[in-house]
Amino acid sequence: MKAAVWHAQRDMRLEDIPEPEVGPEDVKIKVVYAGICHTDVFEYLYGPQTVFNPPLALGHEFSGVVEEVGEAVTGLKKGDPVTGLPYYPCWECTYCQQDLWNLCPSAQAHGMHIHGAFAEYVPLHYRGVYKLPEGVSLEEAATIEPTSVVYRAVKRSGLKKGESVHIVGAGPVGLLLANVAKYKGAGKIVVSEPLDSRREKALEMGATHVLNPEVEDPITRTHEICDGVGAHVSFDCVGTAATLDTAVYSTRRNGRIGILGFGFYESPTYPLMLLAAFASEYTYFATLGYNVEMKEVVDLVGKGELHPGDVISNIIPFDQIIDFFDHFEENRRKYLKILLKIG
């Protein structure tokens, strides 16, 4: 099968590799669309960071159709439109027994340990394959993976109906977060973002207020908008010292601060504001992937409650992937979610 295989920094090759074998509990999926995550681009430019077994096909956001099922698999058949978990948990450890599959120490992740979705076929365990509801397109289904990350983050935040939210950064993750926060019944949803086009998109996705941090102080303005005391929950969707600072100090006392962004283009490490945490009794939390949340998101998209497909800005042919990655740095602020058309 054809795959985009990462070998080293700025060295990705379209190659023929063996198709995945199908075990008794496996499902072989013909990939139709694969989403490009910023982690894929960072790996291409600066890896190895998360790739443990190069050369390896990257990609963990995808949709497709069932090509083949193992002998123990029921409920799925060839031709079914699906998406699924891009990793193999062990299903047996203490974390898996609590449905915390994303924390399984021996999980084998697509695009990290085994070939990912930048390929014509990808294998999944049947327990992590979700058939798409009628009316959900394969294009939109390819955005369910990042939406599941965001959905879990909002769940972990304990967001209550009517509470205020501040989202720092309106890339795909921040935009999806606005959409999920709206669905969850948040009151004021404030989004800080310097790009005009992304602020406009944030309003379409559920934001009630948008701020340009290059023109106005997002900390002061968020306090003013949110009862004079700040947001109940803030999310840093960028991952730099400056954006974390904004998220922290725009949050009211006894509030919660979620960390979803990695500052790949600056420093991937930054100080946690411990003094602020003590002084204001903040709760910090981070989110690693998702588990049962993906099934919930599939159902919500099917019901029209969430609209993750609205973040798609470009669809490019699979054979243009290397050229796209080569020029991503100079153009990255122009894009939202990019899909590869593979099948």
Residues of each region from the PLM?
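Short Gly/Pro-enriched turn/cap motifs at secondary-structure boundaries
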Residues: 7, 18-19, 53-60, 110-114, ...
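Glycine-rich beta-strand-centered segment in the early N-terminal region that forms part
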Residues: 20-34, 47-94, 133-135
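NAD(P)H dinucleotide-binding glycine-rich loop of Rossmann-like/cofactor-binding domains
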Residues: 90-168
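Mid-domain Rossmann-like dinucleotide-binding core that forms the NAD(H)/NADP(H) cofactor-binding site
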Residues: 136-216, 220
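Glycine-rich cofactor phosphate-binding loops and adjacent beta1-alpha1 units
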Residues: 157, 203-283
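C-terminal hydrophobic helical "lid"/dimerization subdomain
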Residues: 245-249, 291-343
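Rossmann-fold dehydrogenase core element
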Residues: 256, 270-310
